[in-house]
C-alpha cells in the first residue's frame, strides 16, 4: 500500500492508503476524497480529476503522455509545471507519501 495525501484548496488534508495498480484518481474516489469528480471514469477524456502534484514529487512521476497534456489544457487553472490528471498516475510503492493539491474546482 502507498499513502497518498490529498490537500483540498481550503487546506483540508486527506491521507488514504492506495493499493498498487490503482490510479491516484481511483484511490481518491474509493476513499471519498472531495474534489476529484472523474466524470469520464478514468478514460483521459475529461479534466475533472485534475490536481497539482507537489513540486517535490514532480520529477518522481512518469512523464505525462501527449493525450494527458492535451486534456490538461481544459482543466481549471492548469499549471504546466505541476498539473496532472490523477487518472493517469498509477500507484506503486514508489509513490508512498505522494502529495497532490486539489484545485478550487473542476470544470
Curated annotation (Swiss-Prot):
[2Fe-2S] cluster binds at residues 40, 46, 49, 87. Binds 1 [2Fe-2S] cluster. Induction: Seems to be constitutively expressed. Is expressed at a similar level under N-limited and N-sufficient conditions. Its cofactor is [2Fe-2S] cluster. PROSITE patterns: 2FE2S_FER_2, ADX. Disruption phenotype: Disruption of this gene is lethal. GO terms for biological process: P450-containing electron transport chain. Residues 2-106 form the 2Fe-2S ferredoxin-type domain. One of its GO terms (molecular function) is electron transfer activity. InterPro entries: 2Fe-2S_ferredoxin-like_sf, 2Fe-2S_ferredoxin-type, Adrenodoxin-like, Adrenodoxin_Fe-S_BS, Beta-grasp_dom_sf. It comes from the Bacteria. Keywords: 2Fe-2S, Electron transport, Iron, Iron-sulfur, Metal-binding, Transport. Ferredoxins are small electron carrier proteins that participate in various redox reactions. FdVI is an essential protein required for growth of R.capsulatus. May be involved in Fe-S cluster assembly. Belongs to the adrenodoxin/putidaredoxin family. This is Ferredoxin-6. It comes from Rhodobacter capsulatus (Rhodopseudomonas capsulata). The gene is fdxE.
